[in-house]
Amino acid sequence: MSQTFTLCVATDTLVNDAQQIGVAVDELRRIGIQVTAEIVQRPTLHLQLTYYITVPTPSLAAKLNWPAWQTKQIGFSDYLWEETCLECFITGSLAKNEVDYAKNAESYIEINASPDGRYALYRFESYRNPSTLPPDPLYHMDRHERIGIYWEDKSLQQRSPVDTSLSTKSSLASTIPSYERRFSILLNQLPKQQYALNNTVVEYIHPCVILKFNKTALYFAPRHVSPPDFHNRHYWSKFKG
């Protein structure tokens, strides 16, 4: 099963953002982003995340900082949120026992991925805790190795959009600049058709994106608090995978 999210831009500073980028506010509102979350078997279970982005005009696309894919860049890297960044937050009950659940019920995982292949996974005990930067990496349960992501080769090229729901329905839709990245993360199968990343059950999910246009960052999510804060779990969605 798959679940698709349509992301919208945070509007708190959008007028000022448009002025800094040198475009109309409406042009920024017409940036289209969809993220699909899907449980796939290959042969082990993975959570697959596909990010599909359309920018309404070539002139705006020329201002987008979208780093080119580089195989040599694949690996863990901190502070990706300071650039164009594909993100996802995951939370849920823990897969161990009731004592652990009571202690860590507010814990959650943050996934960061750069279009060029860099990535990072972090674990928080509660809202933005620990507060030190960079956050603590997410390790496998043996604590010997960081958890990584697996990039999908066929999504690594810029291409024309095929999903016209993200673009204008004019005859020029095929010329709209578009970008796609897809990666997956290893999951554990649990009873009652539940899935876990490390020992955190995937119950709530919050895919989001930061797009950097020159020096201006725009924030995209299915829903926003004001000011935008991806860590606020009250705006996360129930996972239906």
Predicted segments, located by residue:
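Surface-exposed extracytoplasmic segments
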Residues: 152-192
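Charged, amphipathic alpha-helical segments
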Residues: 47-75, 181-195
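Sequence termini and other peripheral, non-core segments
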Residues: 1-15, 117, 123, 131-135, ...
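Extracellular/luminal beta-rich ligand-recognition
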Residues: 74-163
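Order/disorder boundary and secretion-linked terminal/linker segments
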Residues: 1-67, 227-241
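Beta-strand elements of well-folded, non-transmembrane domains
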Residues: 39-41, 53-57, 92, 117, ...
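Domain-length accessory/inserted modules outside core catalytic folds
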Residues: 4-6, 24-26, 164, 168, ...
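Acidic/polar low-complexity flexible segments
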Residues: 68-71, 77-86, 92-105, 197-241
